[in-house]
Amino acid sequence: MTSTGSTRYDGDSWDLASSVGVTATMVAAARAMATRAENPLINDPYAEPLVRAVGVDLLTRLATGEFNVADLDDDPQRPLGPIGDVADNMAVRTRFFDDFFLAATRAGLEQVVILASGRDARAYRLPWPPQTVVYEIDLPQVIDFKSRTLADLGAAPTADRRVVAVDLREDWPAALRAAGFDPNQPTAWSAEGLLGYLPPEAQDRLLDTVTELSAPGSRLAAECLSGVDPAEEEQIKERMQEVSARWRAHGFDVDMVGLVYFGDRNEAVPYLSDRGWLLTSTPLPELRAANGLAPAAVDDDGPSVDMLYVSGTLYTTPRPDPAP
C-alpha cells in the first residue's frame, strides 16, 4: 500500500464534533451503550453525559438508547453485519485497558500515561491504588472540555490526575515532564484507538518516544491492526465508505476513510519487540470469547483484517548514544 487515502494533512485541526475529534465521541457513545447492556462488562457513568455535552444528535441518541446502532444496517442488499456488535466490541476493548491499568498499578507502578485521552474518564471511574498519578495527554480544547464537563457533574478524580494539554505532534515529552512525569520510574502507557490515526512515520516516532521515556519494568497496552493485505486496501476503503454512508443517511456526516492513514507501515508488535518490549497479542475474537461473548457477526464482504489488543513489559531500554 502506497497511497494514504486520507484527507488529513500536517498541522490539521479539529473540534469535538468533527474530523478525528468526533471519533472519540463515537467511542464514548459506544461505551455508554455497553454500560447499558443487560449484563455489562464495564461501567462508565460518564460516557453518556460527555456525549450529550458534545451535542452531536445521532451520537446522543445512541448513547441514551433512543437509537439502536443495528438500525444503521438497514440495506438488505448490502448488510454491514458486524456494525451491530459495536457495543460488545467496545465493552471488551474498554475492559482490556481497564484490566491492564489496574493490574499494572496494583503491581506497584505509580505513573500512568493515557495518550490521546479523548473522552476517556478512567481517571474518574477506576479504583486506583493510592499514590497513582494519571497523566492525560490530548489537545487543549479536548482536555478543557472534559475537565469542565465532569466538574459540572460534580465528579472528582480517583487518582492524582494531571492534564498535559498538548498536541502529540508537538513536544509532548517536554510537557509531560513539566507536569511531573519521571522517566526513571516505571510507567503504564496506553495507546487506545490511536495508531491508525497517525501517519506511518508518526506511529514509529511515538513508539520510539514511549520506549525512550520508559524505565525497565514499564508496561504498555495498545490496539492495532495486523495482517493488512495491501491487495485489500481498496476493499477496506469501500467498506468504510459504506459505513460512512449509513451514518450520513441518519444525519451524521462523517468520512471514516478520510480520518485514517493508509499506506505501508511497520506493524506495532514486531516494531516494539525489536526495542525491548515483551508483548502478548490477543485478537478481538479471542477477547470476546474470554469475556463470555458469542462470536461477532461475520462480514462476508469485508477484508480479512485482525484487530489486536497488545500488552507487555519493557525489559531493556535502548538509549541513543550520547552526543560526542
Swiss-Prot record:
Entry's EC annotation: 2.1.1.-
Binding sites annotated in the UniProt record for S-adenosyl-L-methionine: D138, D167, L168
EC category name: transferase
One matching Pfam family: LCM
GO annotation terms (biological process): methylation
Keywords: Methyltransferase, S-adenosyl-L-methionine, Transferase
Signal peptide: none
InterPro entries found in the cross-reference section: Ppm1/Ppm2/Tcmp, SAM-dependent_MTases_sf, SAM_mthyl_Trfase_ML2640-like
GO MF entry, a single one: methyltransferase activity
UniProt key word Endoplasmic reticulum: no
Family of the protein in this entry: Belongs to the UPF0677 family.
Function: Exhibits S-adenosyl-L-methionine-dependent methyltransferase activity.
Protein name, per record: Putative S-adenosyl-L-methionine-dependent methyltransferase MUL_0818
Species for this entry: Mycobacterium ulcerans (strain Agy99)
